[in-house]
Design a protein with these regions (language model features):
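NAD(P)-dependent dehydrogenases' Rossmann-like dinucleotide-binding region
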Residues: 141
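N-terminal strand-loop-strand
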Residues: 1-19
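Unchanged
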Residues: 9, 23-127, 131-137, 146-154
């Protein structure tokens, strides 16, 4: 699974782990067009390297964003070219790890007197320099991965 870490200076979700993607523009034909355009802008993924499988159900984040996850395979030959303004790092996590419910964690915190629950999928991987690194995949990204898991095992 191809994931990114957002740069720390972004207004929305700075420093968090996310999928390549972003806001729809008026000229985008649909969610797939948005996903492909944003993936190209953020990580240099050209559409010729993507075999789109389809969309997962829409997901609404705790902060009110409405996300339509688009799922596809990336063909061999793609070279990452990340936009340094938006993307601090691009990395991969094996799908087998992400789809193993033993790796899914539930958390609960209280913020301003309101109990909030969220999922995480901690991953111990290797960064672009080959150094060991811990990644904390959580919130909407972890929840959408959990939805993918539920979809695949149904």
């Amino acid at each position: 699974m191809l994931l990114t870490q957002r740069t720390d200076h972004l207004t929305d979700h700075p420093g968090q782990i996310s999928f390549p993607g972003g806001r729809a523009e008026d000229f985008d034909a649909d969610a797939i067009a948005t996903a492909l355009r944003e993936a190209h802008e953020e990580i240099g993924l050209e559409t010729r390297f993507v075999d789109v499988l389809g969309e997962l159900p829409t997901y609404t984040t705790g902060t009110g964003f409405i996300v339509t996850p688009v799922v596809g395979f990336v063909d061999p030959g793609f070279t990452v070219n990340a936009d340094p303004f938006e993307v601090a790092e691009v990395f991969e996590v094996p799908l087998s790890f992400l789809m193993n419910p033993a790796n899914h964690r539930r958390h609960a915190v209280e913020l301003n007197g309101v109990r909030r629950e969220f999922l995480s999928i901690p991953w111990e991987g290797v960064d672009a320099q080959g150094e060991p690194r811990r990644y904390f995949i959580w919130g909407a990204t972890a929840a959408m991965l959990r939805n993918l898991y539920r979809f695949l095992v149904a």
